[in-house]
Amino acid sequence: FKIDGQSEIKEPIGMFGGRLEANFHVVVGQVSSIKNIARCVKSSGIDFDGITLEPLASADAVLSREEKEAGVALIDIGGGTTDLAIFKDNIIRHTSVIPFGGNIITEDIKEGCSIIEKQAELLKIKFGSAWPGENKDNEIVSIPGLRGRDPKEISIKNLSKIIHARVVEIIEQVYMEIKNYGHEEQKKKLIAGIVLTGGGSQLKHLKQLVEYVTGMDTRIGLPNEHLAGNNSVEISNPTFATAVGLVMNSMEKRKNISVNKNQSEDEDDLENDDKDSNSIESKASQSIFEKFTEKIKTFLENAE
């Protein structure tokens, strides 16, 4: 933010000034896709309160404040897409959605091994590896044949080669986005490297392959970064990073609304003698963010 020409302000709330400026990271999407998501949620009997970009939700669950400050690239590998969010100085700097994820790897296995999708998914989960060099040529897995047909033998090394080819393609596209952000510049360098999350991040040897292709330090992000107590195995699974992040995001919004409401009530008590002044103060207290949020809510409510 910038207040009266003073730049590099991260939190303007509580400061005085006559002019507020800001640089925003705008995320856009297809209207039809957003409305379809809203309709799907509403049809299940759940109220639709808002919408958040997937990697931003995942980032809340798996990234530490120190990583966001140092500079980090979050890669969320889902079923249909691979999402990228880059943070530097605790500010979101770049986002991107790559239209390939775990499902395309399953499809490659299905076509390459001439098997059905269910078998391809099981092979990927149980025997899949992003690094084919570790597999021996004589390692074979046998899967049941269809409708009384003979079992089919699949080479583990060949399976890993199929997975490796597609994963390298996805990583290279993501790394291109990281370079487009300007990672190679000293001021924009991502000191904390890469954090992998999402269901696809559980692929064996993926971390090592990402480090090899990008040359950046990499870790697997689990959604228990900000959770207290003994977390269950299910919640600690990177598959649920986005879900945990959405819950955290919603709780933070409710907390901010509660704080703002209490502050408004205190101001009304202090300025109770001047009704005109109170009216002006009330209008001013509705920030541009609140107005924008109201418009989004109205748009989502009209999804049907």
Segments and roles (model prediction):
Residues 1-73, 116-118, 122-159, 259-304:
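Nucleotide/phosphate-binding catalytic cleft detector across ATP-hydrolyzing
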Residues 29, 129-131, 187-213:
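Glycine-rich phosphate-binding loops at beta-strand->alpha-helix junctions
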Residues 53-60, 104, 225-228:
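Short acidic loop-to-helix transition motifs that present clustered carboxylates
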Residues 63-94, 109, 246:
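Gly/Thr-rich phosphate-binding beta-strand-loop-beta motif of the actin/hexokinase/Hsp70
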Residues 93-94, 107, 155-160, 192, ...:
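Short beta-alpha connecting loops at secondary-structure transitions
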Residues 99-123:
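A conserved active-site cap/scaffold subdomain adjacent to cofactor or substrate pockets
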Residues 171-192:
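Phosphate/pyrophosphate-binding loops at sites that engage ATP/ADP/AMP, CoA/4′-phosphopantetheine
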Residues 221-270:
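Glycine-rich phosphate-binding/hydrolytic loop that grips phosphoryl groups
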